[in-house]
């Protein structure tokens, strides 16, 4: 996790960026957090869908993961330049070093953690997640989630200002923890 808190870090704290694996609750928590703090909410996946006029799965299938990640990187770069926003990112967005730098440099980064068991429960009926669609068809969703966790968890940890588990806590509790820990970090 990041340790240094300079004057620039103090200025960037008016943005909150939520990172973590699929099913961690980034979008749900982000909306509630934005509502409570009276800030504008963005979801990078929804932005991609709005701008392309297609759902994430279609974009992923037609353009491929590499092109999807390029598009995601550009959208996150644009959104993180705004001030006073909450941004829920896609689980794989941290694969881009440019995105990691932008998130880290331009906002307070919250790593929402969850176990693979909770991910399986929370995403079992979600047909919009391209990586899960292909794995569930072959019956190895758990294996895929383990591979993704091994690849991505160190990247989440690298840029996180704080980490919060969403496994056994309701949305309101997580939102309040984020608000409290954000205030403490800016002191």
From Swiss-Prot:
Q: Which reaction does it catalyse?
A: shikimate + ATP = 3-phosphoshikimate + ADP + H(+)
Cofactor binding annotation: Binds 1 Mg(2+) ion per subunit.
Q: Which Gene3D superfamilies match?
A: P-loop containing nucleotide triphosphate hydrolases
Protein localization:
Cytoplasm
Cite the EC number: 2.7.1.71
Q: List the disulfide bonds.
A: none
Provide the alphabetized UniProt keywords. Amino-acid biosynthesis, Aromatic amino acid biosynthesis, ATP-binding, Cytoplasm, Kinase, Magnesium, Metal-binding, Nucleotide-binding, Transferase
Per UniProt, Mg(2+) binds at 27
What pathway does this protein act in? Metabolic intermediate biosynthesis; chorismate biosynthesis; chorismate from D-erythrose 4-phosphate and phosphoenolpyruvate: step 5/7
Set out the biological process GO terms recorded for this chain's protein: amino acid biosynthetic process; aromatic amino acid family biosynthetic process; chorismate biosynthetic process
Location, primary (coarse class) = cytoplasm
Can you name one GO molecular function term for this protein?
A: shikimate kinase activity
Query: What NCBIfam families has UniProt attached to this entry?
Result: PRK05057.1 (NF003456)
- Role noted for this protein: Catalyzes the specific phosphorylation of the 3-hydroxyl group of shikimic acid using ATP as a cosubstrate.
The molecule here is called Shikimate kinase
Which lineage do the record's taxonomy fields give for this organism? Bacteria, Pseudomonadati, Pseudomonadota, Gammaproteobacteria, Enterobacterales
What gene is this protein a product of? aroK
